[in-house]
Curated annotation (Swiss-Prot):
Residues annotated as binding Mg(2+) 1: 409, 416
Cofactor binding note from Swiss-Prot or TrEMBL: Binds 3 Mg(2+) ions per subunit.
Organism: Streptococcus pyogenes serotype M5 (strain Manfredo)
Cited InterPro entries: Aa-tRNA-synt_II, aa-tRNA-synth_II, aa-tRNA-synth_II/BPL/LPL, Lys-tRNA-ligase_II, Lys-tRNA-ligase_II_N, Lys-tRNA-synth_II_C, NA-bd_OB-fold, NA-bd_OB_tRNA
Listed HAMAP family: Lys_tRNA_synth_class2
One Pfam family of this chain: tRNA-synt_2
NCBIfam families listed in its UniProt record: lysS_bact, PRK00484.1
Protein family: Belongs to the class-II aminoacyl-tRNA synthetase family.
Gene3D superfamilies associated with the record: Bira Bifunctional Protein, Domain 2 (3.30.930.10), Nucleic acid-binding proteins (2.40.50.140)
Domain of life of the source: Bacteria
Name of the featured protein: Lysine--tRNA ligase
Gene: lysS
Enzyme Commission number: 6.1.1.6
Taxon lineage: Bacteria, Bacillati, Bacillota, Bacilli, Lactobacillales
Length: 497
């Protein structure tokens, strides 16, 4: 450590370093070693929840706990403290006549933030709080910086996101939110594994962006002297596995899109994609409903959920509506009759729908109408199906009306939560769609995909009829934890330097 760094330390940091050195001089490692616990705070509270002070005294049971010192009070020969572990907090009752003199000195000199191990009798105070009456204390690790203000936690948003470790220490609500996220993902895995799906891993580095309409991050591979992109989806590699005969696969992983940031978008995020051979979009619709309802039940229990004051009936069957019917219901404009692109553009101008240069078909106009007028009305879980071919380059055409595809998106609280379709398995049609996307890219559509010839070649070997699905894990977590910004469900959201 440089002298310059020492000079920058504040008084509290200097005192903590002096205590660190004092521990070392006593032969105590300031940063400790392994420690065996017999229970955590939650296990103790559950085990002894119905025991009175007198009953606990009769039981005379001991426990060994460990955690971070969060509060400490007292003077003379008696002290109280709270120890925080992964499950919560437990109170400590420390008397000088119950521990050794050296042990009591460890307690007296311990700072908030230090880690200690405690062995002692399980008791209940006169105030009724379950506590550990210490008989032995072990110093485990020294905290060289003071914690955030202990009663209110962090309040500065920038610090919360940049220093998530401090947020987790001081804000139990935030800590529990991320535990819920992990449990939600585990339950999704459990659900799919129970349906005989196989979890797989596919590359993050791609030669060509594909599988979604999004702008990629470009990087460079030095050894091969080639530019590569970070994946914007896992779709095309997963469908190659269907070609290879795996039949039921899924992947949960990070996706990277070089686009804007807002309350529901981060440049890197987590998605799950699922593919099932011999299935269509209706089968996948049922699967999607099952995944989300199972995850919701696992972390929120039965019944509807509350999201920002709105009751979401996530436990009931999801509404299903064709995109054209949804547009007609909201705007009165009917796109079922066939029309020219000029007629569609005239309707768009009449309704003041923003138009882009690459909107060269009726399908583009239909999609624009939907985004402009319908999305904001979809509060309860709703499957919108029948997207136009022009905006669905990887979806199979509907056999009864080839202007549309067997595709759906799931909307809840006006936001998209899932995208799925009967997969296009005709390599000739797929190449034609890729070429149309490449043309749109030339016309200024930054989100249009290029041509993935390797994927087309894979399809030429034959892919069975297949249904595929993508779900945004982060948005689903936002819904199930009642949060309004994606940064609150990402442990380390993207931040400016």
């Amino acid at each position: 450590m440089s002298n310059q760094h020492i000079e920058e330390l504040n008084d509290q940091q200097i005192v903590r370093r002096e205590k660190m050195m004092a521990l070392a001089e006593q032969g105590i490692d300031p940063f400790g070693k392994r420690f065996d616990r017999t229970a955590n705070s939650a296990e103790l509270k559950e085990k002894y929840a119905d025991k009175t002070k007198e009953e606990l005294h009769e039981l005379n049971e001991t426990a060994i706990v460990a955690g971070r010192l969060m509060t400490k009070r007292g003077k003379g020969k008696v002290g109280f403290a709270h120890l925080q572990d992964r499950e919560g907090q437990i109170q400590l009752y420390v008397r000088k006549d119950s521990v050794s003199e050296d042990n009591y000195e460890i307690f007296k000199k311990a700072d908030l933030g230090d880690f200690i191990g405690v062995e002692g009798e399980v008791m209940r105070t006169d105030m009724g709080e379950l506590s550990i009456k210490a008989t032995k204390l072990t110093h485990l690790s020294k905290s060289l910086r003071p914690l955030p203000e202990k009663f209110h936690g962090l309040t500065d948003i920038e610090t919360i996101y940049r220093k998530r470790h401090l947020d987790l220490i001081s804000n139990r609500e935030s800590f529990d939110r991320f535990v819920t996220r992990s449990k939600m993902i585990s339950e999704i895995r459990r659900y799919l594994d129970g349906l005989d799906f196989l979890e797989v891993e596919t590359p993050v580095l791609h030669n060509e962006a594909g599988g979604a309409a999004a702008r990629p991050f470009v990087t460079h591979h030095n050894a091969q002297n080639i530019d590569m992109v970070l994946r914007i989806a896992t779709e095309l590699h997963l469908k190659r596995l269907i070609v290879g005969g795996m039949e039921r696969v899924y992947e949960i992983g990070r996706i990277f899109r070089n686009e804007g940031m807002d309350a529901t978008h981060n440049p890197e995020f987590t998605s799950i994609e699922v593919y099932q051979a011999y299935a269509d979009y209706l089968d996948i619709m049922n699967l999607t409903e099952g995944i989300i309802q199972h995850a919701a039940k696992a972390v929120k229990g039965d019944g509807p959920i509350d999201y920002q004051g709105t009751e979401i009936r996530i436990n009931e069957p999801f509404k299903r509506v064709h995109m054209v019917d949804a547009i007609k219901e909201v705007t009165g404009v009917d796109f079922w009759p066939e029309m020219t692109v000029e007629e569609a553009i005239a309707l768009a101008k009449e309704k003041q729908v923003p138009l882009e240069k690459h909107f060269t078909s009726v399908g583009h106009i239909i999609n624009a109408f939907f985004e402009e007028f319908v999305e904001e009305t979809l509060v309860q879980p709703t499957f919108v199906f029948g997207h136009p071919v022009e905006v669905s380059p990887l979806a199979k055409k509907n056999p009864e009306d080839t202007r549309f595809t067997d595709r759906f998106e799931l909307f809840i609280m006006t936001k998209e939560y899932a995208n799925a379709f009967t997969e296009l398995n005709d390599p000739i049609d797929q190449l034609s769609r890729f070429e149309a996307q490449a043309q749109a890219k030339e016309l200024g559509d930054d989100e249009a995909t290029g041509i993935d010839y390797d994927f087309v070649e894979a399809l030429e070997y034959g892919m069975p009829p297949t249904g595929g699905l993508g779900i945004g894990i982060d948005r689903l977590c936002m819904l199930l934890t009642n949060t309004t910004t994606i940064r609150d469900v990402l442990l380390f959201p993207t931040m400016k330097p």
